[in-house]
A protein has these predicted regions:
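Primarily recognizes Gram-negative and organellar outer-membrane beta-barrels
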Residues: 1-236
Length: 236
C-alpha cells in the first residue's frame, strides 16, 4: 500500500508586459492511494492486481489589466478524479530441448472524471464550463518462447495482442518482440532485436479543460489523444 496527500498548495503568478499585467492565484489539493496484491506460486504462475485512486481539487482566480484600459477577471473551481483497476496472470514453464514458454493475460480499467466551472467572469475573456468522463479499457494476451544454447547463443520471440478502448475509439493490435544473440567468440558477438514500444497519454493531458496562465496565454487539454506505437529494429 502506498499513499500521499498534499493539501493546501498555493501558487501565485504575476505577469507584466507590453500587452497586459495579470495576477493569478491557484490553490490545489492532491490525494493518491494505491493497493497492490501479488501471488507467486511454486510452479511458474504469477497472479496480481492493483487499485489506484487519485483526486485533485483546484481553485483559481485571475485578474488582468490590458494596455487599452480594459480589464478581465474570473474565479474557477475544478477537479479530477481517477479510479484505475488492473489484474494479470502469467504462466512460465520449461519445455523439452531447453525451450522456455510463457503466456498470460492482463486487464486494466480506468475511469477519469474532470470538470471546470467558472464564476464572476468579467471583461473580454472566453470561458467555458467543462465536464469529461473518460472510460478506458485495455486487454492484453501474450505468448513468448525462448532458448539459451550452450554455445552462448540465445533466441527469444514474443507477441502481445491488445484490445484497447477509450470513449468511442476501439482498436485491435499485435505487438511483436524478438531478439537474437549469436556468440562466435568473446570478440565477435552479433545481436539483432525487434522491439515495440507503446506510449499512453497521461490522464492529465487528456483533460477537456482550458487553463489560463495569464491574461493572454491559454493551455488547452486534448481529450482525443490516442496511444502512440514505435517499432525499433536494431543490430550490432
Amino acid at each position: 500500500y502506498t499513499g500521499s496527500y498534499t493539501p493546501d498548495q498555493y501558487n501565485n503568478s504575476r505577469t507584466s508586459g507590453n500587452y497586459q499585467t495579470s495576477n493569478v492565484d491557484k490553490y490545489i489539493d492532491n490525494q493518491m492511494r494505491n493497493i497492490t496484491l501479488q501471488y507467486h506460486s511454486g510452479f511458474g504462475l504469477d497472479i496480481g492486481g492493483d487499485y489506484t485512486y487519485y483526486t485533485s481539487n483546484n481553485a483559481k482566480r485571475l485578474y488582468a489589466d490590458y494596455q487599452d484600459g480594459s480589464q478581465s477577471s474570473f474565479s474557477m473551481v475544478g477537479g479530477q478524479k481517477i479510479d484505475r483497476y488492473s489484474i494479470y496472470a502469467d504462466q512460465k514453464q520449461s519445455l523439452s530441448k531447453g525451450w522456455n514458454l510463457g503466456y498470460g493475460i492482463s486487464y486494466r480499467f480506468a475511469k477519469d472524471l474532470d470538470f471546470q466551472t467558472y464564476d464572476k467572469v468579467t471583461g473580454n475573456i472566453q470561458t467555458q464550463n467543462t465536464y469529461s468522463n473518460l472510460r478506458e479499457q485495455t486487454t492484453n494476451f501474450y505468448v513468448s518462447l525462448s532458448k539459451n544454447y550452450t554455445t552462448g547463443t540465445s533466441l527469444s520471440v514474443s507477441a502481445t495482442g491488445e484490445y484497447y478502448t477509450i470513449g468511442n475509439y476501439h482498436k485491435w493490435a499485435v505487438y511483436p518482440q524478438a531478439s537474437l544473440t549469436y556468440f562466435k567468440t568473446p570478440k565477435h558477438v552479433f545481436q539483432l532485436s525487434l522491439s515495440t514500444d507503446k506510449t499512453y497519454p497521461s490522464y492529465w493531458d487528456m483533460q477537456s479543460s482550458v487553463s489560463y496562465l495569464n491574461g493572454y496565454t491559454e493551455l488547452w487539454g486534448t481529450p482525443n489523444l490516442k496511444p502512440m506505437t514505435n517499432y525499433n529494429l536494431n543490430g550490432s
